[in-house]
Regions:
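Active-site-proximal, structured, solvent-exposed surfaces of multi-pass membrane proteins
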Residues: 1-186
Length: 186
């Protein structure tokens, strides 16, 4: 997991145009810009019928899935090893984290409305993810204190770029750099 704050190269930010990409293509493009030699998420076979989708996992991997727009509000994952997981508010559209599965595992995703929801499944390439992570982890903020109203930390910037924070853009937060209040870009 990346720290709360990390530096990102401006060239990467400028080159990462994801406006015409879906969420998986955008992540793969970012991983490539961060040095990955292969896609971070690779499509794997899946089949969708009314009421459920099935993924037959061929290789050990973390599995994710996207789906077409739907009015279905909840889905349930059932894995052949007995694990289950519920997803709510899926009508909002997000990537489903189906967890780590070994080769030979069958994943079924059932929906509450007995509708056909077309699923596209992906396997995570750990080498590509690690390469991207290591690039982002080169310059990170060390948090020195935090509370529900204040976060304090330091970062020694060795290469110019943009400081990225994993903090929600909620009213009331102020950003200070070297003691000077600065307007954040969101």
């Amino acid at each position: 997991v990346l720290p709360l704050g990390f530096m990102m190269d401006e060239d990467v930010i400028d080159a990462w145009d994801y406006s015409d990409l879906d969420e998986i293509e955008a992540q793969n493009r970012l991983a490539e810009l961060l040095g990955a030699d292969e896609p971070m998420l690779t499509e794997i076979p899946s089949e969708s019928v009314v009421g459920e989708s099935t993924i037959d996992v061929q290789e050990d991997a973390y599995i994710f899935a996207t789906y077409e727009s739907t009015t279905v509000d909840s889905m349930t994952e059932e894995i052949s090893d007995g694990r289950t997981k519920s997803f709510t508010k899926v009508s909002h559209g997000y990537t489903l984290d189906l967890g780590y599965c070994t080769a030979g595992t069958q994943v079924r995703i059932k929906n509450s409305n007995e509708e056909r929801v077309n699923i596209t499944a992906y396997a995570l390439n750990l080498d590509a993810a690690d390469t991207a992570y290591q690039t982002l982890n080169e310059q990170t903020m060390e948090m020195t204190s935090f509370s529900d109203t204040k976060i304090t930390g330091t970062i020694d910037v060795k290469k110019e770029g943009r400081l990225i924070f994993a903090v929600a853009d909620d009213a009331g937060w102020k950003l200070y750099v070297d003691g000077e209040q600065t307007d954040p870009e969101v």
